[in-house]
């Protein structure tokens, strides 16, 4: 077999794109199921009173529906963030390192998930969100410094 006849290797980026789109779809599907299940136990709310959902969740939580909601948010945000970050890294940070893109996508998903959890428990504040964001950004900066030194 000569060099011209060698089989072409399957591009790894296509596999990563497939995984990111699958995570995005899984998150979207899980969120649609979690929305149909009530995140609280008890009678359904009348239409137009969605503002009462946090109070009902705190009064009688439906743990499987909340777990599905939080897991779906994590999967969907990870997939969406990966697609956006991959494009940004392709434009500005060549060569693109897959581990860095996945790590940043997961950190963004952790940030969004923590904000969703805080909002669900009515403990969300802009100052707390900024503190969490600064902590995660510093973590990413320190990880980039460590990887660069190795």
Where do the language-model regions lie?
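Membrane-helix boundary elements
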Residues: 23-76
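Non-transmembrane, aqueous-exposed alpha-helical and coiled segments at domain scale
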Residues: 71, 78, 96-97, 103, ...
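Hydrophobic, membrane-inserted alpha-helices
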Residues: 108-117, 133-136
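Juxtamembrane membrane-interface segments at transmembrane alpha-helix termini
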Residues: 139-150
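Alpha-helical transmembrane segments and their helix-start/interface "positive-inside/aromatic belt" motifs
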Residues: 2-22
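Membrane-helix boundary connector in multi-pass membrane proteins
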Residues: 114-130
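Short juxtamembrane and helix-loop transition motifs at transmembrane-helix boundaries
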Residues: 61-68, 85-98
